Amino acid sequence: MQGVYPAIITPLKENKVDYDGLRNNIDFLIENGVSGVIPVGTTGESPTLTPLEHEKVVEKVVEFVDGRVEVIAGTGSNSTSEALEFSQYAEDVGVDGVLLITPYYNKPTQEGLKRHFGEIANSINVPIVLYNVPSRTALNIEPETIKYLFNEYSNISAVKEANPNLSQVSEVLDSCDIDILSGNDELTLPIISLGGKGVVSVIANIAPKEFVQMVDFANAGKFDKAKEIHYKLFPLMKLMFVETNPIPIKTAMNMLGMPSGELRLPLCEMAESNKLKLQNALNNLGLLK
Protein backbone atom coordinates (compact mmCIF):
# COMPACT_ATOMS: atom_id res chain seq x y z
CA MET A 1 0.00 0.00 0.00
CA GLN A 2 1.27 3.43 -0.93
CA GLY A 3 -0.22 6.88 -1.30
CA VAL A 4 -3.25 8.67 0.10
CA TYR A 5 -6.24 6.75 1.40
CA PRO A 6 -8.97 9.14 2.62
CA ALA A 7 -10.94 7.89 5.58
CA ILE A 8 -14.24 8.91 4.05
CA ILE A 9 -17.18 10.38 5.92
CA THR A 10 -20.65 8.86 5.83
CA PRO A 11 -22.89 11.67 4.52
CA LEU A 12 -26.29 11.87 6.18
CA LYS A 13 -29.54 13.51 5.16
CA GLU A 14 -32.42 13.61 7.64
CA ASN A 15 -30.48 11.05 9.71
CA LYS A 16 -30.32 8.53 6.85
CA VAL A 17 -27.27 7.65 4.80
CA ASP A 18 -27.09 9.88 1.71
CA TYR A 19 -25.93 7.41 -0.93
CA ASP A 20 -26.05 9.94 -3.78
CA GLY A 21 -23.80 12.20 -1.73
CA LEU A 22 -21.50 9.28 -0.98
CA ARG A 23 -21.13 8.58 -4.70
CA ASN A 24 -20.34 12.24 -5.41
CA ASN A 25 -17.69 12.37 -2.70
CA ILE A 26 -16.05 9.18 -3.97
CA ASP A 27 -15.94 10.47 -7.55
CA PHE A 28 -14.34 13.72 -6.34
CA LEU A 29 -11.63 11.83 -4.47
CA ILE A 30 -10.84 9.48 -7.34
CA GLU A 31 -10.69 12.36 -9.83
CA ASN A 32 -8.06 13.95 -7.60
CA GLY A 33 -5.71 10.99 -7.55
CA VAL A 34 -6.20 9.09 -4.29
CA SER A 35 -4.90 5.53 -4.07
CA GLY A 36 -7.97 4.18 -2.32
CA VAL A 37 -10.83 4.97 0.02
CA ILE A 38 -11.56 3.72 3.52
CA PRO A 39 -15.25 3.65 4.45
CA VAL A 40 -16.89 2.97 7.83
CA GLY A 41 -13.94 3.83 10.00
CA THR A 42 -13.81 6.42 12.76
CA THR A 43 -14.29 9.25 10.26
CA GLY A 44 -17.22 7.36 8.75
CA GLU A 45 -19.05 7.33 12.11
CA SER A 46 -19.03 3.54 12.24
CA PRO A 47 -19.95 3.41 15.95
CA THR A 48 -23.33 5.02 15.23
CA LEU A 49 -24.19 3.13 12.06
CA THR A 50 -26.53 0.17 12.43
CA PRO A 51 -25.09 -3.20 11.35
CA LEU A 52 -27.27 -3.10 8.21
CA GLU A 53 -26.13 0.44 7.37
CA HIS A 54 -22.53 -0.58 7.96
CA GLU A 55 -22.84 -3.43 5.48
CA LYS A 56 -24.76 -1.41 2.90
CA VAL A 57 -22.26 1.46 2.97
CA VAL A 58 -19.43 -0.97 2.22
CA GLU A 59 -21.44 -2.62 -0.54
CA LYS A 60 -22.29 0.74 -2.11
CA VAL A 61 -18.72 2.04 -1.88
CA VAL A 62 -17.49 -1.04 -3.75
CA GLU A 63 -20.20 -0.42 -6.36
CA PHE A 64 -19.43 3.30 -6.71
CA VAL A 65 -15.65 2.84 -6.88
CA ASP A 66 -16.10 0.14 -9.55
CA GLY A 67 -12.48 -0.99 -9.46
CA ARG A 68 -10.94 2.44 -10.05
CA VAL A 69 -9.04 2.49 -6.74
CA GLU A 70 -8.72 0.23 -3.71
CA VAL A 71 -11.50 -0.09 -1.14
CA ILE A 72 -10.26 -0.90 2.37
CA ALA A 73 -13.28 -1.31 4.64
CA GLY A 74 -13.29 -0.75 8.37
CA THR A 75 -14.40 -4.06 9.87
CA GLY A 76 -12.95 -3.97 13.37
CA SER A 77 -14.69 -4.59 16.66
CA ASN A 78 -13.83 -5.40 20.26
CA SER A 79 -15.52 -8.75 19.63
CA THR A 80 -13.41 -11.13 17.56
CA SER A 81 -16.43 -13.02 16.22
CA GLU A 82 -18.13 -9.79 15.17
CA ALA A 83 -15.01 -8.46 13.44
CA LEU A 84 -14.53 -11.81 11.71
CA GLU A 85 -18.13 -11.92 10.50
CA PHE A 86 -18.04 -8.41 9.09
CA SER A 87 -14.61 -8.97 7.51
CA GLN A 88 -15.97 -12.02 5.71
CA TYR A 89 -18.98 -10.02 4.53
CA ALA A 90 -16.73 -7.23 3.24
CA GLU A 91 -14.59 -9.75 1.37
CA ASP A 92 -17.70 -11.30 -0.16
CA VAL A 93 -18.91 -7.96 -1.56
CA GLY A 94 -15.55 -7.24 -3.17
CA VAL A 95 -13.34 -5.05 -0.98
CA ASP A 96 -9.61 -5.01 -1.62
CA GLY A 97 -8.73 -5.20 2.06
CA VAL A 98 -9.99 -4.62 5.58
CA LEU A 99 -8.95 -2.24 8.33
CA LEU A 100 -9.03 -3.79 11.80
CA ILE A 101 -8.90 -1.52 14.82
CA THR A 102 -7.35 -2.77 18.04
CA PRO A 103 -10.13 -4.06 20.32
CA TYR A 104 -11.19 -1.17 22.54
CA TYR A 105 -12.60 -1.03 26.07
CA ASN A 106 -11.94 -4.68 26.93
CA LYS A 107 -8.17 -4.08 26.46
CA PRO A 108 -6.76 -7.52 25.58
CA THR A 109 -3.17 -8.44 26.32
CA GLN A 110 -0.61 -8.63 23.52
CA GLU A 111 -1.22 -12.38 23.41
CA GLY A 112 -4.93 -11.67 23.05
CA LEU A 113 -4.18 -9.32 20.16
CA LYS A 114 -2.15 -12.02 18.42
CA ARG A 115 -5.04 -14.46 18.70
CA HIS A 116 -7.67 -11.87 17.74
CA PHE A 117 -5.96 -10.74 14.54
CA GLY A 118 -4.71 -14.25 13.78
CA GLU A 119 -8.18 -15.78 13.89
CA ILE A 120 -9.48 -13.18 11.45
CA ALA A 121 -6.43 -13.52 9.18
CA ASN A 122 -7.01 -17.27 8.98
CA SER A 123 -10.64 -16.73 7.96
CA ILE A 124 -10.25 -14.29 5.04
CA ASN A 125 -7.97 -13.95 2.04
CA VAL A 126 -7.88 -10.19 1.44
CA PRO A 127 -5.08 -8.05 2.91
CA ILE A 128 -5.46 -6.82 6.49
CA VAL A 129 -4.42 -3.38 7.68
CA LEU A 130 -3.93 -3.25 11.45
CA TYR A 131 -5.20 -0.01 12.99
CA ASN A 132 -3.25 1.19 16.02
CA VAL A 133 -4.84 4.20 17.73
CA PRO A 134 -4.04 4.15 21.45
CA SER A 135 -5.71 7.53 22.05
CA ARG A 136 -9.09 5.91 21.34
CA THR A 137 -8.53 2.31 22.43
CA ALA A 138 -6.27 2.81 25.47
CA LEU A 139 -4.15 0.00 24.04
CA ASN A 140 -0.99 -0.05 21.91
CA ILE A 141 -0.06 -2.83 19.50
CA GLU A 142 3.54 -3.28 20.56
CA PRO A 143 6.21 -3.46 17.82
CA GLU A 144 7.02 -7.07 18.72
CA THR A 145 3.35 -7.99 18.26
CA ILE A 146 3.24 -6.31 14.85
CA LYS A 147 6.42 -8.15 13.84
CA TYR A 148 4.92 -11.47 14.96
CA LEU A 149 1.65 -10.90 13.09
CA PHE A 150 3.42 -9.81 9.89
CA ASN A 151 5.71 -12.84 9.91
CA GLU A 152 3.00 -15.32 10.89
CA TYR A 153 0.14 -14.30 8.56
CA SER A 154 0.76 -13.55 4.89
CA ASN A 155 -2.33 -11.36 4.53
CA ILE A 156 -1.45 -9.02 7.40
CA SER A 157 0.37 -6.54 5.22
CA ALA A 158 0.09 -3.01 6.62
CA VAL A 159 -0.45 -0.86 9.70
CA LYS A 160 -2.36 2.38 10.04
CA GLU A 161 -0.19 3.86 12.76
CA ALA A 162 -1.85 6.59 14.84
CA ASN A 163 0.50 6.33 17.80
CA PRO A 164 2.19 9.77 17.80
CA ASN A 165 5.39 8.26 19.22
CA LEU A 166 7.70 7.98 16.22
CA SER A 167 9.86 5.50 18.10
CA GLN A 168 7.06 3.01 17.49
CA VAL A 169 7.39 3.47 13.72
CA SER A 170 11.17 3.16 13.88
CA GLU A 171 11.02 -0.03 15.94
CA VAL A 172 8.46 -1.63 13.63
CA LEU A 173 10.29 -0.80 10.40
CA ASP A 174 13.61 -1.86 11.90
CA SER A 175 12.17 -5.30 12.62
CA CYS A 176 10.04 -6.13 9.56
CA ASP A 177 8.97 -4.94 6.10
CA ILE A 178 5.30 -4.26 6.84
CA ASP A 179 3.82 -1.21 5.07
CA ILE A 180 3.11 1.67 7.43
CA LEU A 181 0.54 4.34 6.69
CA SER A 182 0.33 7.36 8.94
CA GLY A 183 -2.92 7.59 10.85
CA ASN A 184 -2.32 11.26 11.55
CA ASP A 185 -2.18 13.87 8.77
CA GLU A 186 0.32 16.01 10.70
CA LEU A 187 2.80 13.12 10.98
CA THR A 188 2.65 11.97 7.37
CA LEU A 189 6.00 13.42 6.31
CA PRO A 190 7.94 12.28 9.40
CA ILE A 191 6.57 8.77 8.99
CA ILE A 192 7.40 8.64 5.27
CA SER A 193 10.91 9.89 6.05
CA LEU A 194 11.34 6.85 8.31
CA GLY A 195 10.16 4.44 5.61
CA GLY A 196 6.37 4.70 5.74
CA LYS A 197 4.40 4.58 2.50
CA GLY A 198 1.55 7.07 2.87
CA VAL A 199 -1.42 8.08 4.96
CA VAL A 200 -4.98 7.29 5.91
CA SER A 201 -6.11 10.88 5.76
CA VAL A 202 -8.93 13.02 7.12
CA ILE A 203 -8.01 16.30 5.42
CA ALA A 204 -7.89 14.56 2.03
CA ASN A 205 -11.69 14.55 2.07
CA ILE A 206 -11.52 18.26 1.19
CA ALA A 207 -7.98 18.75 -0.16
CA PRO A 208 -7.17 15.48 -1.95
CA LYS A 209 -5.17 16.92 -4.84
CA GLU A 210 -2.80 18.82 -2.57
CA PHE A 211 -2.35 15.93 -0.17
CA VAL A 212 -1.68 13.47 -2.99
CA GLN A 213 0.96 15.84 -4.37
CA MET A 214 2.59 16.11 -0.95
CA VAL A 215 2.77 12.35 -0.47
CA ASP A 216 3.98 11.77 -4.03
CA PHE A 217 6.78 14.29 -3.52
CA ALA A 218 7.74 12.67 -0.22
CA ASN A 219 7.76 9.15 -1.65
CA ALA A 220 9.99 10.43 -4.47
CA GLY A 221 12.41 11.91 -1.92
CA LYS A 222 11.50 15.50 -2.81
CA PHE A 223 10.96 16.59 0.77
CA ASP A 224 11.53 20.31 0.15
CA LYS A 225 8.51 20.38 -2.16
CA ALA A 226 6.53 18.12 0.16
CA LYS A 227 7.24 20.40 3.11
CA GLU A 228 5.87 23.42 1.25
CA ILE A 229 2.50 21.71 0.95
CA HIS A 230 2.69 20.38 4.51
CA TYR A 231 3.14 23.84 6.00
CA LYS A 232 0.46 25.30 3.73
CA LEU A 233 -2.07 22.74 4.98
CA PHE A 234 -0.77 22.47 8.55
CA PRO A 235 -3.21 24.97 10.16
CA LEU A 236 -6.13 23.08 8.62
CA MET A 237 -4.67 19.72 9.67
CA LYS A 238 -4.62 20.88 13.29
CA LEU A 239 -8.20 22.13 13.10
CA MET A 240 -9.39 18.72 11.95
CA PHE A 241 -8.87 17.59 15.54
CA VAL A 242 -9.83 20.71 17.48
CA GLU A 243 -12.95 18.71 18.32
CA THR A 244 -13.60 14.98 18.08
CA ASN A 245 -13.20 13.56 14.57
CA PRO A 246 -15.33 13.63 12.38
CA ILE A 247 -17.01 16.78 13.73
CA PRO A 248 -14.53 19.22 12.10
CA ILE A 249 -14.28 17.48 8.72
CA LYS A 250 -18.05 17.14 8.33
CA THR A 251 -18.44 20.78 9.34
CA ALA A 252 -15.82 21.82 6.77
CA MET A 253 -17.52 19.80 4.05
CA ASN A 254 -20.85 21.43 4.83
CA MET A 255 -19.17 24.85 4.59
CA LEU A 256 -17.77 23.87 1.19
CA GLY A 257 -21.15 22.66 -0.08
CA MET A 258 -20.03 19.03 -0.23
CA PRO A 259 -22.34 16.16 0.75
CA SER A 260 -21.90 15.73 4.48
CA GLY A 261 -24.98 16.53 6.53
CA GLU A 262 -25.48 16.17 10.23
CA LEU A 263 -23.74 14.07 12.85
CA ARG A 264 -25.35 11.33 14.88
CA LEU A 265 -25.50 11.57 18.65
CA PRO A 266 -23.52 11.39 20.82
CA LEU A 267 -21.51 13.54 18.37
CA CYS A 268 -22.99 16.99 17.89
CA GLU A 269 -22.42 20.22 15.98
CA MET A 270 -19.17 22.13 16.28
CA ALA A 271 -18.82 25.01 18.75
CA GLU A 272 -19.31 28.41 17.08
CA SER A 273 -15.86 29.61 18.14
CA ASN A 274 -14.24 26.64 16.42
CA LYS A 275 -16.45 27.04 13.36
CA LEU A 276 -15.05 30.54 12.93
CA LYS A 277 -11.47 29.25 13.14
CA LEU A 278 -12.29 26.58 10.58
CA GLN A 279 -13.95 29.06 8.24
CA ASN A 280 -10.91 31.34 8.42
CA ALA A 281 -8.55 28.46 7.63
CA LEU A 282 -10.64 27.42 4.63
CA ASN A 283 -10.68 31.04 3.45
CA ASN A 284 -6.92 31.35 3.82
CA LEU A 285 -6.44 28.29 1.61
CA GLY A 286 -8.83 29.63 -1.01
CA LEU A 287 -11.16 26.67 -0.59
CA LEU A 288 -14.23 28.75 0.26
CA LYS A 289 -15.71 30.44 -2.79
Swiss-Prot record:
Protein's cellular compartments: Cytoplasm
SUPFAM superfamilies in the record: Aldolase
Molecular function in Gene Ontology: 2-dehydro-3-deoxy-phosphogluconate aldolase activity; 4-hydroxy-tetrahydrodipicolinate synthase activity
Residues the entry annotates as binding pyruvate: 43, 200
EC number: 4.3.3.7
Assigned keywords, A-Z: Amino-acid biosynthesis, Cytoplasm, Diaminopimelate biosynthesis, Lyase, Lysine biosynthesis, Schiff base
Pfam families recorded: DHDPS (PF00701)
Chief location: cytoplasm
Catalytic activity: L-aspartate 4-semialdehyde + pyruvate = (2S,4S)-4-hydroxy-2,3,4,5-tetrahydrodipicolinate + H2O + H(+)
Subunit structure: Homotetramer; dimer of dimers.
PANTHER family the record matches: 4-HYDROXY-2-OXOGLUTARATE ALDOLASE, MITOCHONDRIAL, DIHYDRODIPICOLINATE SYNTHASE
Record function comment: Catalyzes the condensation of (S)-aspartate-beta-semialdehyde [(S)-ASA] and pyruvate to 4-hydroxy-tetrahydrodipicolinate (HTPA).
Name of this protein: 4-hydroxy-tetrahydrodipicolinate synthase
Record organism: Methanococcus maripaludis (strain DSM 14266 / JCM 13030 / NBRC 101832 / S2 / LL)
Organism lineage: Archaea, Methanobacteriati, Methanobacteriota, Methanomada group, Methanococci
Gene designation: dapA
